[in-house]
């Protein structure tokens, strides 16, 4: 039986937490579906009791869009002073602190023993490539093949060309273990084309769909599409769901 190398927790939309051997990573948190019920709150991935004593907590925000960033993340320092923040340079904060690291496309940084490289996006901000505890993790942010039906043919071609150029650049990474990638239902019948292209070209060991809001049904459809390409894609049903890698 394969040893579990990471546990992935779906928070909401493009927000995920990943528990590796020695680290706890959070990507693109903007809200978490919980009620005021105390028992329910304790099921929350980011309930204070769950992370207050954790060491090596790294919080990533790929850009300043309201569905990828919430300044609430800085409140977590009140109950865990070990948190490190890795933020796209388009994110503005009131006061910089020693535990804030800002990064832009093509930059590479080591934050303690975690390697981070910023790749580009087809929207604002960046995508993240993270190497930690022997794993290589990619979070796309808003990098996607944004094929909107209402766009002109010329605009659609620009979107395709830009997207494929970013994926070509990412191919310099020879092996990605876990990748998080958008499957946005607003794109209608074209929701899957970016994820399918990404999967075929990059070949991650595990492909985790994101950026679908409340439309969890779309992850099942996407997983079925990816089966035809021999890429393992995850079906997500509910917030707080645990995925083992």
PLM features: residue spans?
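Metallo-beta-lactamase
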Residues: 2-3, 82-135, 230-245
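Active-site-proximal beta-strand elements of phosphoester/diester hydrolases
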Residues: 7-10, 25-28, 115-120, 136-142, ...
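Binuclear metal-ion centers of metallo-dependent hydrolases, dominated by the metallo-beta-lactamase
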Residues: 9-11, 24, 99-108, 191-245
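Active-site environment of divalent metal-dependent phosphoester hydrolases
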Residues: 13-14, 33-34, 64-69, 91-95, ...
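Pre-active-site segment of Zn-dependent metallo-hydrolases
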Residues: 17-60, 71-76, 143-172
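Active-site neighborhood of phospho(di)ester-bond hydrolases with catalytic His/Asp-centered motifs
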Residues: 26-28, 55-67, 85-89, 138-141, ...
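Active-site HxH/HxHxD metal-binding segment of metal-dependent hydrolases
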Residues: 46-108
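Active-site-proximal loop/helix segments of hydrolase catalytic cores
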Residues: 122-200
């Amino acid at each position: 039986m394969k040893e579990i190398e990471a546990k992935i927790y779906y928070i909401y939309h493009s927000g995920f937490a990943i528990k590796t051997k020695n680290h706890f990573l959070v990507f693109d948190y903007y809200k978490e579906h919980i009620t005021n019920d105390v028992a329910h709150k304790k099921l929350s991935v980011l309930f204070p009791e769950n992370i207050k004593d954790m060491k090596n907590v790294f919080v990533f925000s790929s850009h300043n869009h309201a569905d990828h960033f919430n300044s609430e993340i800085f409140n977590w320092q009140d109950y865990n002073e070990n948190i490190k923040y890795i933020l796209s340079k388009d994110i503005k904060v009131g006061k910089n602190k020693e535990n804030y690291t800002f990064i832009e496309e093509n930059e590479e940084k080591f934050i303690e023993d975690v390697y981070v490289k910023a790749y580009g996006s087809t929207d604002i901000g960046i995508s993240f490539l993270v190497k930690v505890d022997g794993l290589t993790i990619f979070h796309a942010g808003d990098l996607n093949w944004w094929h909107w039906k209402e766009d002109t043919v010329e605009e659609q071609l620009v979107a395709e060309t830009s997207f494929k150029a970013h994926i070509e650049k990412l191919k310099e990474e020879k092996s990605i273990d876990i990748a998080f990638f958008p499957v946005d239902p607003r794109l209608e019948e074209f929701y899957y084309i970016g994820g399918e292209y990404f999967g075929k070209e990059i070949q991650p060991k595990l492909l985790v769909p994101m950026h679908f809001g409340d439309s969890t049904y779309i992850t099942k459809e996407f997983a079925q599409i990816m089966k035809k390409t021999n890429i393992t894609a995850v079906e997500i049903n509910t917030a707080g769901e645990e995925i083992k890698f």
